[in-house]
Amino acid sequence: METSRIAIAALALSASGLVYIAQREGYSEQAYPDPVHGTKVPTAGFGTTGPDVKMGTTLPPVRALVRLRADASEKEVALKRCIGDVLLYPREWDAFVALGYNTGTAPVCLNNERSGPSTIVRRLQAGDHKGACDAILLYDRAGPVIKPQDRCSHPDNRTCRGVWADRQRLRAMCLGEPTP
């Protein structure tokens, strides 16, 4: 039986949420070019980016785990600020933090087309938790979408099917369903 939802201010990414991110991102001791942005966004460890990560940077396993936790904590702070005072299950929080870790928090917080809060934020603030979890599936791209086939959810897309599979797993996690 699931416990009650908890105030977002009291939530922290769970150990299983952190392990999920680590497994999804994979580990690389040597910095590599980001799959979407190339060498403009060098990535090392468990998906770590930032001004201190350059091509040639090495991040040994222990440092990479410490950095993963610190990076995830930064995402949590940003998400708490944009989502506001809502109640969530820990599994919902884990899913939104994992999404923000992968996409960056700006897309999870804001809708640039509407100049306002994202669908996830609007639905959470309205108390529509299922709708907010379903909205994870809206993050179905890696890079710009020029034509429908560019969406990772499109059956003809062969370049980012892993992104779509991840979004389906995050939605299931958020809803407390078995992960596909």
Residue ranges and their predicted role:
Residues 39-46, 61, 75, 93, ...:
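Small-residue-enriched, tightly packed secondary-structure blocks
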Residues 30, 42-44, 86, 99, ...:
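Flexible, active-site-adjacent loop/turn segments at secondary-structure boundaries
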Residues 74-115:
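Active-site nucleophile-His-acid catalytic modules used for acyl/amide transfer and hydrolysis
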